[in-house]
Design a protein with these regions (language model features):
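Metallocofactor- and cofactor-centric catalytic cores in central/energy metabolism, strongly enriched
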Residues: 1-220, 224-236, 252-256, 356-442
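Histidine/cysteine- and/or acidic
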Residues: 216, 240-243
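Short flexible/disordered coil segments
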Residues: 222-237, 276-287, 304-313, 334-343, ...
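Conserved anion/nucleotide-ligand pocket segment
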Residues: 242-244, 248-319
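Glycine-rich, aromatic-lined ligand/substrate-binding cores of catalytic
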Residues: 293, 297-393
Length: 442
């Protein structure tokens, strides 16, 4: 075991959530209930997973907190921004994800979380009509206002560290523009020039967080920190960044099942995925421009796992789209289901001598129940990374994300294979804990 330089998790950790809707309030309520011994944080890797450290006779399995100094749940303080002014208790009741009996025991704590005014541009989420919005004339004013929010929250709550995580709606798609998004100076100039076409509000949150010494996590598929200018800022401020898009339901299944097809050397003709979802996220994604952003995130999973150029007999012939497998993703807004998302996958595969077979997957899940532990894990592990001196893209957090960040300017591919991602996660924890990384089967 090596000596590590990870700083201890002393003092309070402020978790500032962009968005105070279903996901955020389910996360907050679960943490509060767990702290009181009234619930268990099931689904959280940081609270339940055990990693093998050492080999042979020295082998043992330990919780993350026994390997690295994680922040304690008792030390977490929540803050939030939202376009709607309702406090976290009111928002949790409105979302109807959790039963009233699971919210009321921590009503007093939830009521104290009153969302700050959001940095918002309705053109980026046309289906939202909240009025709890900052009056900013330019994108740079948004940045300055958000920076002040972070400073004030940190001081007022006596926090020693802050992490900012996006749990708000999906913005419209913003194509990466080399003239704006590749260099920090150009990004800052565009913010100051109020370039609303190329500078999304989410970029203002990320810029504000990083410049205030807080890691930033993008939980939606927005174009935000997955641009070279933000990587430059993360390097400059020595802050971790992670993204993008929480991997909760259908894509989690896809990233776990696609490797089975690939490992078994089966062929793929097509994969059709569709969902019904009735919460506010579904409402926003019912807008075509916003769905386009999400579609890109959900489609990106297969192409790095089942590669046509590596196995042309199984997955197609290079760039010839007529012979590649067909991959389609759809999300349908269906209010009666609220947060209880349902996903269907039809997978057309083929085996020995080309004979066809099918796989059908029907996942009836609860969107926010699956997302809440991801917020806990991503915030705690990003805080850990910052204290360990890790900055820039945190690839070891790919396990939790649909479209993991990677340096596409250098031809790097994202790692989407769930099992490879899990190895990356475990090895990062091992290394930060002073143990040797390895890829042995546990």
């Amino acid at each position: 075991m090596k000596q590590t330089n990870v700083k201890p998790a002393d003092g309070k950790l402020g978790i500032m959530v962009v968005g105070c809707g279903a996901v955020a309030t389910t996360f907050m309520t679960g943490v509060f209930m767990t702290r009181r011994g009234l619930a268990k944080p099931i689904g959280s890797m940081t609270q339940y997973d055990k990693i093998r450290v050492g080999r042979g006779e020295d082998k043992k399995y330990l919780h993350y907190k026994d390997i690295v100094p994680l922040a304690k749940l008792d030390d977490i303080v929540f803050g939030s921004w939202d376009v709607y002014p309702q406090n976290a208790y009111q928002a949790a009741m409105y979302a109807e994800v959790l039963k009233e009996k699971d919210i009321n025991p921590v009503k007093d704590e939830l009521e104290k979380i009153k969302p700050m005014k959001a940095a918002f541009d309705k053109n980026y989420a046309k289906r939202l009509d909240g009025d709890n919005v900052k009056d900013c004339k330019t994108r740079w004013e948004m940045v300055e206002a958000l920076r002040k929010d972070i400073r004030d929250f940190k001081e007022q709550n006596g926090c020693s560290r802050i992490v900012v995580i996006w749990a708000a709606s999906t913005e419209i798609y913003v194509p990466v523009d080399e003239k704006i998004h590749y260099h920090l100076a150009d990004l800052e100039a565009a913010m100051k020039a109020d370039d609303r076409e190329h500078i999304a509000p989410s970029m203002c949150y990320a810029y504000a967080a990083l410049t205030e010494g807080a890691p930033f996590i993008m939980g939606a598929p927005n174009t935000t920190v997955d641009i070279p200018a933000m990587w430059e800022l993360a390097e400059k401020t020595k802050m971790p960044i992670a993204g993008k898009d929480f991997k909760t339901g259908q894509t989690l299944v896809k990233s776990g099942f696609a490797p089975i097809i690939g490992t078994r050397c089966l062929g793929l003709h097509g994969w059709f995925s569709t969902n019904i979802l009735g919460n506010r996220d579904g409402l926003v994604l019912d807008e075509p421009a916003n769905f386009h952003t999400k579609e890109g995130s959900k489609l990106s999973t297969l192409e790095t796992i089942l590669k046509p150029d590596v196995q042309p007999d199984l997955y197609g012939h290079g760039n010839d789209e007529d012979t590649q497998y067909y991959h389609k993703v759809r999300i349908n807004y269906y209010p009666p289901r609220n947060d209880n998302k349902e996903g269907w996958d039809n997978i057309d595969i083929f085996g020995w001598m080309g004979y066809p077979m099918q796989v059908k997957i029907n996942f009836l899940c609860r969107d926010s129940i699956l997302a809440a532990p991801l917020l806990l894990d991503l915030t705690l592990l990003s805080d850990l990374a910052a204290r360990a001196g890790r900055y820039g893209i945190q690839r070891f957090l790919s396990f939790f994300l649909k479209a993991p960040m990677h340096d596409y300017t250098q031809g790097e591919e994202a790692v989407n294979n769930l099992y490879q991602q899990y190895t990356m996660l475990k090895n990062a924890i091992r290394e930060m804990g002073g143990y040797e990384a390895d890829e042995e089967i546990d």
